[in-house]
Amino acid sequence: MDEALGPPPAMAEKADELTPMLSQYLELCERYDDALVLFQVGDFYETFCEAAETTARLLEITLTQREDSTGTYPMAGIPIDNAESYIETLLDAGYRVAVADQVEAAEAASGLVDRAVTRVVTPGTLTETELLAEADNNFVACLTDGYGLALLDVSTGDCYATRLDRTAGVADELERFDPAEAVVGPDAPTDCFGEDCMVTPYERSAFELDAARERVEAYFGSTALASDAEIRACGALLAYAEYARGTTTDGETEPLDYINQLTRYDPREYMLLDAVAVRSLEIFEPRHVHGLEGAALVETLDETASALGGRELRDWLRRPLLDADRIERRLDAVEALVERVSDRERASERLADVYDLERLVAAVSRGRADARDLRALESTLSVVPELRACLDDAAGESEKLASVRERLDDCTAVRELIDRAIVDSPPVEITEGGVIRDGYDERLDELRATERDGKAWIDDLEAKERERTGIDSLKVGHNSVHGYYIEVTNPNLDAVPDDYQRRQTLKNSERFYTPELKEREDEIIRAEDRADELEYERFRSVREEVAAATERIQETARAVAELDVLCALATVAAQYDYCRPTVDADGIYIEGGRHPVVERTESSFVPNPTDLPATEPLAVITGPNMSGKSTYMRQVALTSVLTQLGSFVPAERAAVPIFDRVFTRVGASDDIAGGRSTFMVEMTELSTILDAADGRSLVVLDEVGRGTSTRDGYAIAQATTEYLHDEAGAFTLFATHHHELTDVAAELPQARNYHFAAARTADGVEFDHDLRPGAAEASYGVEVAEMAGVPEAVVDRADELLGGMRSNDTPPAAAASTDGGRVPEALLAELEAVDLAETTPLEALNLLSRLKSQLD
């Protein structure tokens, strides 16, 4: 166990002798023994002993000491005002953080100030907006040994549950949601989570079926969870959320009423994009920088105006649809918004004024929202009628837009309550007054009037006293220690009236008060204190009334999110000349297809067609490196993803089948941490494809067998081609440098050859990036190597060897070097297989080193 966690041994040994404050700290460390306890002392959060040493090291802050009758303890603290950035650092270092706040004012405490853990901060249970990405969900997952999977975003209340068949399915599903933390039960697999996911073993009792079912029903009522594994996962996840919620600063348990809707789903209802496909197609993260920062599909599509829309878009991308009717409904909505430019632009302008409604109402429900949050919520709800008006016409042309419009509820009573109760520009603090609007509460107005009248009397006092005493230099002032006073300089002390009572002596003056001034001051203080208390009570009451409308506000938030995504997709379609695809076609038919990301970064992008009928679903694609093979295959795959997302696609015309899965085998890389070579990684990915691909799959293969010898590589490539043709029947795009494979494809009845042509010029090779029927005539590998800067001697020798092979029809292994030595079999194959678009500078240097060593 980490020494920074749990009760400090040095304190535990002297538990009976510790001061009350350190005893309180020790008790909290025992209760939250899996977290670093940040213990509020005044304006700082303090840590002690081993926790202090760890905190000081990680946060690079000073390690001090606290002396006590029982000894001296290391201590390190952080200012409360900057706590969030420090907490983020502790989370990044792999720690959970229990924040223990003072839940009563120090001046109100009769003895030891009461403290309670108001929140347990973990990577998966964050609710602090400054620590969360606006456009991304922050999920905590829970996995059971029966492959029950539940996911919860504590910041929004989004909750999902499903049951998976096997470990591989778990890994794929986790790739979809990318949880920041995973809660696992006894015997559950733990090797399927990403490197950035904190794995948290949780207490066995939370996974017991009866307790889990009771908890699930308490949150969601009678549920449609189909298996015990799902119930256990969901129940345990809710238990973990309860553990992390802590208490409010009022000492009350933080409610989680906003977690009220459970989405039970079947992964088979959505297109499966596994981890390899998501990375290869650059759905969320770019593998290369195409001259544009953030060049991934999601950024290309993300014209959303709100955080709600940004998260919804990513959810749609995680789960493209398989149901043709649902896809068509989305496409109908996008088309209606494409055609109604003015309505769409007005809606987008108003969506830009929308705050994060989901996280706002969640904060309200948890009792964490301040007055500014309520004003932001009111401001967002006030936009809703205008959004609804933008859809008056379009809703008649789209069932989905009609549904969105119907669900856009401006919650009039909530808006009016907030507007009536909360001032327009409230302060950050909600306990120090200035939050509730005048006229909202009669008693509060009376107290404020008393306060104002008293201060007005004091404002006039200085002039009155100067006139009464004849002391022109007399001043009336105030400070936090002595309150209100009348100050008279030493030369004028003889003129001080008898009713002046001394309050403070200074070097050059005396400060006094009068009975009437004291009385007025007491009235002001009493009015201020009672007004602050009453104002906070009224604010909490308003917040609770707003919280009662949580479900209505959440439904509006979901409708706003959908509208934002549909407007974004329509904007992209209109701006970049996308077309509406035909769904559920019997083949892939695309005219003028383009890559949605690459076309934005290249001024002369060349569109290409695709013609793959169901009767000939396999295409073998040849051509030199840099000719466009990889980009072309990815754009076909992305066209399918976009179609099933419900988006228009970058093409003149497009008709595609509905694919239940997209497989990719693109590029080459070692898995050093996993102890796997490039070739082993490649074969593992290929095995997954061949095991699962069928007639409803789209397979993209960019070189197979490149990580081994030429003969072995070709044998694997041919066997793969034949298997995909004869057994799987999947729609397949197979790019290869094995030109012999084109002869195989020519003999297969359900396969076609395509190629990207190139021509030799005085400057090397010229690519036209046009896809054409038939096989390529040459690979131009030597020419591309020359363009890449391979040493002239290597290029010349390779050209000489290639010429000899062509004239003698000699295989690479039989060609001899000029000095009678034997040329390594892989030399020419490596040159031909160099893919400049995939090669980093370091890889290029390593390649040159290998070639030189082979020649030597």
From Swiss-Prot:
Entry annotated with the keyword DNA damage: yes
Single biological process term from Gene Ontology: mismatch repair
One example GO MF annotation: ATP binding
Keywords from the named record: ATP-binding, DNA damage, DNA repair, DNA-binding, Nucleotide-binding
Record-linked SMART domains: MUTSac, MUTSd
TM regions (residue ranges): none
Alphabetized NCBIfam families for the sequence: mutS1, PRK05399.1
Function: This protein is involved in the repair of mismatches in DNA. It is possible that it carries out the mismatch recognition step. This protein has a weak ATPase activity.
Protein name per its UniProtKB record: DNA mismatch repair protein MutS
Organism field: Natronomonas pharaonis (strain ATCC 35678 / DSM 2160 / CIP 103997 / JCM 8858 / NBRC 14720 / NCIMB 2260 / Gabara) (Halobacterium pharaonis)
Highest classification ranks of the organism: Archaea, Methanobacteriati, Methanobacteriota, Stenosarchaea group, Halobacteria
